[in-house]
Swiss-Prot record:
Lineage per the UniProt record: Viruses, Duplodnaviria, Heunggongvirae, Uroviricota, Caudoviricetes
Enzyme Commission (EC) number: 3.5.1.28
Gene3D superfamilies hit by this protein: Peptidoglycan recognition protein-like (3.40.80.10)
Taxonomic source organism: Listeria phage A511
Compartments in which it is found: Secreted
Region annotation (Disordered) ranges: 175-201, 248-267
Name of the molecule in the record: Endolysin
Length: 341
């Protein structure tokens, strides 16, 4: 059993929403290679109204708790949040020794939280909110929707840990005395095999693309979806299934040469880093505060630029985001947003 100390840094003022059921512990990773655990905690403390989880793991096996368990946290989308007993973020590192410690504690913490909630130590099993277990953010996106995130598998894979290995390590940790120590991991990143040992027919879109050494980022999947004629791609399970089928079928064959994009008419909207956050709204509802589904955070990225999908007038635009899909945003000049050609 791996020992760790929980650093209590509960964010003040968090809501205490009642769960519909303590069915999940959600496994995340931060997707920010340039940030530390302290930076992640600090950022979430300042911006919890956009999203928050319960725990961070990083910095060589440190655990920082920022929210109480057994309440609704806002880290996995509208369909999973109200069933999530806890949500855990694994911070990124480029140091092999640090990763080994982080991963060991990550597995132990996920198992410990699941046991406290009476949740079975299974990974990504089932397809409904009633199917209890430890769930990845990818499982939520693929099975429940409400999010397009695919973590933590790409990051774990970069250190030679497959989904099957992750599941095995969770099971070993759950055995307590049967493990003796935490699952042993290589001290250096394991090289990716030239030929995947996994049965490719059983892989989802992102895992399949990773196995084929393809760029599995949302932006590239969105690009491929357009090439294959999948309209309004937002990363839903059905769209991913269709895209996977088309990728397996070979390169797209347009009947006519694809026209070059017109740079003169494609306008973009720029959100500067020093003007705070911009709330986003569904495309089928009025862009008012009560309908906000989240916010984009230009400060975190030094500014953000999006192609305008549709100008709805009065300073309201439709944009395509990685986190929320296609949404409305209010970008009038008074907000500090800038329209560019």
């Amino acid at each position: 059993m791996v020992k760790y100390t929980v650093e209590n840094k509960i964010i003040a003022g968090l809501p205490k929403g009642k769960l519909k059921g303590a069915n999940f512990v959600i496994a995340h990773e931060t997707a920010n290679s340039k940030s530390t655990i302290d930076n992640e905690v600090s950022y979430m403390t300042r911006n919890w109204k956009n999203a928050f989880v319960t725990h961070f793991v990083g910095g060589g096996g440190r655990v920082v708790q920022v929210a109480n368990v057994n309440y609704v946290s806002w880290g996995a989308g509208q369909y999973a949040n109200s069933y999530s007993y806890a949500q855990v973020e694994l911070c990124r590192t480029s140091n092999a020794t640090t990763f080994k410690k982080d991963y060991e504690v990550y597995c132990q913490l996920l198992v410990d939280l699941a046991k406290k909630a009476g949740i079975p130590i299974t990974l990504d099993s089932g397809s409904k909110t009633s199917d209890k277990g430890i769930k990845s953010h990818k499982w939520v996106a693929d099975k429940l929707g409400g999010t397009t995130h695919q973590d933590p598998y790409a990051y774990l894979s970069s250190w030679g840990i497959s989904k099957a290995q992750f599941a095995s390590d969770l099971a070993k940790v759950s055995g307590g005395g049967n493990t003796g120590t935490a699952p042993a991991k290589p001290s250096t990143p394991a090289p990716k095999p030239s030929t995947p040992s996994t049965n490719l027919d059983k892989l989802g879109l992102v895992d399949y693309m990773n196995a084929k050494k393809m760029d599995s980022s949302y932006s590239n999947r969105d690009k491929l979806a357009k090439q294959y004629g999948i309209a309004n791609y937002s990363g839903t399970a059905s769209q991913n299934t269709t895209l996977l089928s088309k990728i397996k079928g070979g390169a797209p064959k347009p009947s006519t040469p694809a026209p070059k994009p017109s740079t003169s008419t494609a306008k973009k909207i720029y959100f500067p880093p020093n003007k705070g956050n911009w709330s986003v709204y569904p495309t089928n509802k009025a862009p008012v505060k009560a309908n906000a589904i989240g916010a984009i955070n230009p400060t975190k990225f030094g500014g953000l630029t999006y192609t305008i999908q549709k100008d709805r007038g009065n300073g309201v635009y439709e944009i395509q985001t990685d986190q929320f899909g296609r949404v409305q945003v209010y970008g009038a000049p008074s907000t500090g947003a800038v329209i560019k050609k």
